Amino acid sequence: TNAYPLSQYKAILFDFDGVLGKTMEDNYTAWAYSFVPYGVKIKREEYFLLEGAPPKKVAEIFLKKNHLGIEFVDDIVRTKENYYLENRSFSFYDGVQELIENLKANGRQLALVTGSSYQRLMGTDITSFLNQFDVLITGDQVSQGKPHPEPYLLGAQKLSVTTSECLVIENAPMGIKSAKEAEM
């Protein structure tokens, strides 16, 4: 027997990077590139543990770990975003588009909750896909990103559902913590 039937949830809230879109490797490469001028080599595993956190937070963590000043944060984030947008090779995971269409056809409310900026999300040229979501929550809409619960709480609020009526689909430790803190 299924302990968590999907029918108990009115809303499904999805992360984007690494859940719907195959973006993890492109993101890692962009972060690694952005730190080269500072003599910092980022390990793939280190980045994946931070995936989902706001970009400025990720930059701060790597700068502090390497005993560099946080005055470089904005330059690093800008370099990372520009590199990502110029070099990405975006695609969805298999079955994602069909899953979203099926959930909508079965009356589920859908939210996309991502730490990415609105500009970066729109830069993926998937507007028709994004239009299937009832709510989009991007990193620039919240004052505290993942692992803080604010992004998922805002998603539930905008969908007009309680947190117990929400199911979160996440891949990253920061996002999972965010969802748990939001009691989803």
Q: What is the predicted role of each segment?
A:
Residues 19, 114-116:
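Conserved phosphate-coupling serine/threonine residues in phosphotransfer and NTP-handling enzymes
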Residues 2-3, 8, 85-112:
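Short, acidic loop-to-helix structural element flanking the phosphoryl-transfer center
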Residues 34-35, 54-68, 156:
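Helix-loop "lid/cap" segments that line or gate small-molecule binding pockets
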Residues 20, 92, 110, 144, ...:
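Conserved SAM-binding loop
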Residues 63-98:
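Metal-dependent phosphoesterase signature
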Residues 117-167, 173-181:
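Substrate-recognition "cap/lid" segment bordering the active-site pocket of phosphatases
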